[in-house]
Amino acid sequence: MKIGLMGGTFDPPHIGHLLIAEQAKEQLQLDAVWFLPAKLPPHKQSTVTSAAKRLELVRAAVRDNQDFSVSEIEFERETKSYTFDTIRELKRRYPEHAFFFLIGADSLVSLGTWHRSEKLYKEIEFGAVARPGSRYLIPEGARVTAVDMPLLEVSSTDIRQRVARGRSIRYLVPEPVRQLIEEWNLYAT
């Protein structure tokens, strides 16, 4: 099987994440997309929402799509989650699968700074999704396939700010995610 991997903090997951996954699934001819929420993201000092709640938000976001699922592999570690380590472990557990790591094209610029990046390039191919204002600057040695998608300016930061200001996030996040945000009183100040 060809599996797309979508890592992230997902604080919260939104329609942009789902659109990226769907477009990558179609264009890269993937059989499934696995969402990999980071328990302890290495690039952030802290998250707004607990890891357990972010995991539940991702589950709620993908539950209506049979081709999407959530992996808890990064929750098995008590230390920061590095993509290289996660990919190696997934390949060990599922040697019959071919994996693609889905990434925003704007993140390609910093890919060389990722933990063990040169070895990561040998481990996995990347599906790079264009974001508004980004260009494909592919690091030497990285295997990258472009994924086109409609440009959609939505971010987790904007969603958190909207909630804090009492503004609607309807249609920016899946309805089950919106309901959990409201129920748990997330992001309100």
UniProtKB/Swiss-Prot annotation:
It is an enzyme of class 2 (transferase). One of its GO terms (biological process) is NAD biosynthetic process. Its EC number is 2.7.7.18. Pathway: Cofactor biosynthesis; NAD(+) biosynthesis; deamido-NAD(+) from nicotinate D-ribonucleotide: step 1/1. GO terms for molecular function: ATP binding; nicotinate-nucleotide adenylyltransferase activity. Keywords: ATP-binding, NAD, Nucleotide-binding, Nucleotidyltransferase, Pyridine nucleotide biosynthesis, Transferase. InterPro entries: Cyt_trans-like, NadD/NMNAT, Rossmann-like_a/b/a_fold. Disulfide bonds: none annotated. Pfam families: CTP_transf_like. It catalyses: nicotinate beta-D-ribonucleotide + ATP + H(+) = deamido-NAD(+) + diphosphate. Belongs to the NadD family. Catalyzes the reversible adenylation of nicotinate mononucleotide (NaMN) to nicotinic acid adenine dinucleotide (NaAD). This is Probable nicotinate-nucleotide adenylyltransferase. It comes from Exiguobacterium sibiricum (strain DSM 17290 / CCUG 55495 / CIP 109462 / JCM 13490 / 255-15). The lineage of its organism: Bacteria, Bacillati, Bacillota, Bacilli, Bacillales.
